[in-house]
Amino acid sequence: MSPGPPAVGGVSPPVMVPGSAPPFQPTHQYFQHHYHQTPPGKLRDRSPRLSAEMRKNRDTATSSPASSGVSIQQRRGSTTQNSGVGSIGLPVLGGRGRGVMSDGHMQRTFHEAMRQRRTSLPANSLSLNGAKVTGSSLSEAKGLIADMLMNKELPGNVASCLRAVTMLLEQRPLPLNGLLNDFGLPSVVENPYGGESMVVGASKPRISNITFSTVTSATGLPTVPAEPNKARSSSYWKTEASPSNNNEHETPVDLLRKISVSRKESGTHVDTVVTTIDGQRYDTRELDTDPDLAETAVWSFPIFQMSRKHPQTILSRLTYNIFQQAELFRIFKVSPIKFFNFFHALEKGYWEIPYHNRIHAADVLHGCYYLSAHPVRSTFLTPKTPDSVLTPPHPHHQHSSIMSQLSTLELMALFTAAAMHDYDHPGRTNAFLVQVEDKKAILYNDRSVLENHHAAESWKLLNKPENHFIENLDPAEMKRFRYLVLEYILATDLKQHFEIIMTFTERLTEIDVQVETDRLLIGKLLIKMADINSPTKPYGLHRQWTDRICEEFYEQGDDERRRGLPITPYMDRGDAQVAKLQDSFIAHVVSPLATAMNECGLLPILPGLDTSELIINMEHNHRKWKEQIELENGGSYEAQITCNGGTAVNGVIEEESASTSDSPDPRRDSPLDSDLSQ
């Protein structure tokens, strides 16, 4: 069959095939739908009526019975080649023929289609000219976003989105990205304190730091829940006239004295005597003058000395003291009766076991307070842009504390989570509960079993009407408070240890304290450091905690032996390896976290010292354990006796008064003694 007449306008005319169905005749709707152009003399009509007719004609043509008996070759029809070079064939609707368009016509058609495209749809990924984004374009984009953020009337969700886009546009080096590589850690580290494997490697893919809800806006963008923005959310910022406003030379001890004096002068006291629902009596005036509680600003806080004086109320007493110092009673109108009801019931829910008891909970709470209250030398704790919801610190402050950068709601959540974080701990590890198919492991699907249990059970306790001390929070604050508490508690699972450290080091140069997720990340670091702080304490305290964790491990080993299970490493009472346990724990778990926080200036440094006392104590304690390992491996009995002026029992060096809870000075044998005396 000879070809038909030449194509006109780039579209082949219909070709008749003997015995076939009538040729397809392009209609007005056909041109509009396929080529985005209007036949001569026609105006565009996008009315719903024509759209419906077009769909009807298309369906009729497709299902026409006349085409049912036509061969594939007949339905395909003939192809008319255009005289232009490089033409592109376009399929004809219904598959009855094929036409061609020139390159120029196709380009015009594409641009016309882009002009008609809905602006709410995702951006098209095709590029006809292959243009690339330049640095100047990025700078211009960041400038435009900065100008938009200057508008104080922007909705909260829009401002959050713009800040997130600004961070994505930043391209800065990550100085601590390879920090974990410096420790020579293997890809998988066995957790000596839990018997589980911890993965050391690249962090998970970057997750947006914005929490989106369902798509409800007219533009198709997901909405962002607005952050509570109340005066009290940033009320921990102190004015110059505030009695608790510190200068660069003040210490938290000075602040405690000022707060106490100010409280007495103003008469702003909670009820003098509070009696809980179970009859426990608290005298708040006595709590305000407790000499042990006056030492909360010291890292070597005498926790065991206080526990001997108040064995059943140590956690509630310490929590009251810290809440008072942070002025949380006044800011959130906390009921003293409900406060003591909850925290006393909470401490009663801790088991009488060697390590994971109410003393450990109080120690973690103290660690969170110490790390957040002392000034640190981190550069990213200063607000970076003028649209911050937080008031900037005093311009003459050389250093700022983490406490001054967190909202009071975040502070209360951090302190509450620290007190709750090991509630109802049975003295067994997650791995043990999974292995014996404990009901808690079944309930939480073997994932963060104990951490989920602590969070769920302690929150149930808090929700009791007589314990609900957060009753004056509004719904948004309540939701945020619960979210923060759960995140902080779940972060104490050591299986997340390296993931949190990697996330922090990767975001180090981008961290902005105005961003909720960055403040949450800092809070996770604080509670994690407080939870494993034992090796960073003076040796006297560290040795007491070591004896306690070993005894709890031995009890699990005894249980495993009774059940006929393999005994977890370091938990066999007949094969004590205390020095190796602590060496592994410090090298693989504590040191990476402490070093990362110290490198970025998140650990407090006392006046007169070049580095944090936590790092000094950790290195000192680690050296002592490594020396003991060397002696156990090859040292003589006489060498063990004379080492460090201590005595040796069964090959284990014991310094005098170091491992007894009656030691009057918890700083005994600390390398800081000589430094501070100088």
Curated annotation (Swiss-Prot):
Q: What are the positions of the active site? A: H356
Per the UniProt record, one Pfam family is PDEase_I
What detail does the entry give on cofactor binding?
Answer: Binds 2 divalent metal cations per subunit. Site 1 may preferentially bind zinc ions, while site 2 has a preference for magnesium and/or manganese ions.
What Gene Ontology terms describe what this protein does at the molecular function level? 3',5'-cyclic-AMP phosphodiesterase activity; 3',5'-cyclic-GMP phosphodiesterase activity; metal ion binding
- Where is composition skewed (Low complexity) in this entry? 7-19
Its recorded reaction(s) are: a nucleoside 3',5'-cyclic phosphate + H2O = a nucleoside 5'-phosphate + H(+)
Q: Where is this region: Disordered?
A: 1-27, 52-95, 223-250, 654-678
Biased-composition ranges, Polar residues, are: 60-85, 231-246
Q: What class of enzyme is it?
A: hydrolase
E.C. number, please?
3.1.4.17
Q: Where does a divalent metal cation 1 bind?
A: H360, H421, D422, D531
One GO biological process term? phototransduction
UniProt domain PDEase: residue ranges: 281-632
Q: Which UniProt keywords apply?
A: cGMP, Hydrolase, Metal-binding
According to the lineage, what is the superkingdom?
A: Eukaryota
Cited InterPro entries: HD/PDEase_dom, PDEase, PDEase_catalytic_dom, PDEase_catalytic_dom_sf, PDEase_CS
Q: Quick one: which residues bind a divalent metal cation 2?
A: D422
Which cofactors does it use?
A: a divalent metal cation
- Family under the similarity heading: Belongs to the cyclic nucleotide phosphodiesterase family.
- Under what name is this protein listed? Probable 3',5'-cyclic phosphodiesterase pde-3
**Organism of provenance:** Caenorhabditis elegans
**GN (gene name):** pde-3
